[in-house]
Amino acid sequence: MSMAEYKGKVKNIQDTPFGYTLSLIGGKWKMVIIYLLAEDQPIRFKELKRQIGTITYKTLSSQLKELEADGLVKRKEYPQVPPKVEYSLTDKAGTLLPILEELCEWGVKNQNN
């Protein structure tokens, strides 16, 4: 259903596909993480933290766990010392990439307005 088809019928935004999508990618960091993983994957935790910069280790860990639980991020552990863990996008997350491209295009058009 399109947005117009829900007009006047929705009592709770969480009951819509839009609400479901926001529950997966909403928040301050999830889209940033998905964007960075789309640019450079697989990527290790510390490299992801370095690229984001202002996120805390605890928050990054929490956001990655949520994205993994929602099926958007894969976590691969390597049995070695020191431990090595890499993160990458799932196929499900890959279907979000055209939306990210559209957001980037919107930003290009509107950034300086």
Curated annotation (Swiss-Prot):
Keywords: DNA-binding, Transcription, Transcription regulation. Residues 16-113 form the HTH hxlR-type domain. It comes from the Bacteria. This is Uncharacterized HTH-type transcriptional regulator BH0655. Pfam families: HxlR (PF01638). One of its GO terms (molecular function) is DNA binding. SUPFAM superfamilies: Winged helix' DNA-binding domain. The keyword rRNA processing does not apply. Coiled coil: none annotated. Gene3D superfamilies: Winged helix-like DNA-binding domain superfamily/Winged helix DNA-binding domain. It comes from Halalkalibacterium halodurans (strain ATCC BAA-125 / DSM 18197 / FERM 7344 / JCM 9153 / C-125).
